[in-house]
From Swiss-Prot:
It holds the Pfam family Toxin_20. One of its GO terms (molecular function) is toxin activity. Residues 23-48 form a propeptide. It comes from the Eukaryota. Belongs to the neurotoxin 12 (Hwtx-2) family. 02 (Hwtx-2) subfamily. This is U4-theraphotoxin-Hhn1ab. Postsynaptic neurotoxin. Keywords: Disulfide bond, Neurotoxin, Postsynaptic neurotoxin, Secreted, Signal, Toxin. InterPro entries: Hwtx-2-like. It is found in: Secreted.
Length: 85
């Protein structure tokens, strides 16, 4: 009984991992089909970095370290910048 249960759970875990990996590959292939050149991808990355640093609300008090406030819309403050979670 225990062996059967372990086998079923193992198969279920493998199926979930396989499905997740397949979805990631499909998403990557769709990005590649768009045909976006590397220079445009670099520009998008720069925009995201700017977006992260701008969307984080940080308050300075004199010479003290920054106090992190809550970021909005799925962003989390980390290292004085917002990071998408």
């Amino acid at each position: 009984m225990k062996v059967t249960l372990i086998a079923i759970l193992t198969c279920a875990a493998v199926l979930v991992l396989h499905t997740t990996a397949a979805e990631e590959l499909e998403a990557e292939s769709q990005l590649m089909e768009v045909g976006m050149p590397d220079t445009e991808l670099a520009a998008v990355d720069e925009e995201r970095l700017f977006e992260r640093s701008v969307s984080c609300e940080i308050e300075k008090e004199g010479n003290k370290d920054c106090k992190k406030k809550k970021c909005k819309g799925g962003w989390k403050c980390k290292f004085n910048m917002c990071v998408k979670v």
